[in-house]
Amino acid sequence: MTILPISAFSDNYIWTFIDKIAGVLDCVDPGESAPIIRFAQSNQLTLRTILLTHHHYDHIGGVDSLIKQWPSCKVYGPIDERISNLTHPIKQGQSVQVGSLHFHILFNPGHTSTHISYYEPQQGWLFCGDTLFSAGCGRVFDGTIEELHESLLLFKKLPRNTKIFCAHEYTLQNLKFAHTVEPCNSSVINYMQQILKQPSPCTLPSNIDLELSINPFLRTDKEQVKQYALSHGANSSDSLDVFEVLRNQKNSFK
């Protein structure tokens, strides 16, 4: 089985698992249907499973058309009235079998109130939707900043070699903000230079080890990150206070 990012909209990735021997593919958060249909038809594949992380349209917008094309397709996602056509509503603590892959469901509210991620421990894969980005994290919509903070603390506990399959290509812009927070962080500087030199615009998947060195939202315990937050209105150097200031500053960062 191989993993391929199929581009959608301006910066979305629809992560796709391809099993050519079985003649099937599975995908995560298909915000658009056309790219998946084109790929499947050109490779003579049948869509078997859709995994959804949350209700935002750029993650679920293609589902209706895809299940019309493949009526037997299974659709997994969080229990949320804003998501229709789920064949398998799932909760935290449940698991999902997709071919040979066995995903653990992680409840990661914050970006939204019902956001989930799919973690495959044997492969070391994390499909985290909009909760964690490379060098960044999602905005808070109908979740809370406290929930988002806890969700990222959970990710910090995963094995360092865990690959992170984010849903958007935001890495370069996130690194610019990370450099503002930690201008002396050589890991941020070096990674930004590496990305600017590489021929492909795709910077994903990332991994936990890299993110712990470049992502300010995972580095709220670092002195320079604390000082940045305190200088921008943090009430204290506690992790949550630092995290909240970082998120607020990133919201308006150009």
From Swiss-Prot:
Pfam families: HAGH_C (PF16123), Lactamase_B (PF00753)
Record's cofactor remark: Binds 2 Zn(2+) ions per subunit.
UniProt entry keywords in alphabetical sequence: Hydrolase, Metal-binding, Zinc
Positions of Zn(2+) 2 binding: 58-59, 130, 168
Needed cofactors: Zn(2+)
List of residues binding Zn(2+) 1: 54, 56, 111, 130
UniProt key word Nucleotidyltransferase: no
Task performed by this protein: Thiolesterase that catalyzes the hydrolysis of S-D-lactoyl-glutathione to form glutathione and D-lactic acid.
Assembly notes: Monomer.
Identification of the protein by name: Hydroxyacylglutathione hydrolase
Organism lineage: Bacteria, Pseudomonadati, Pseudomonadota, Gammaproteobacteria, Legionellales
Gene of this entry: gloB
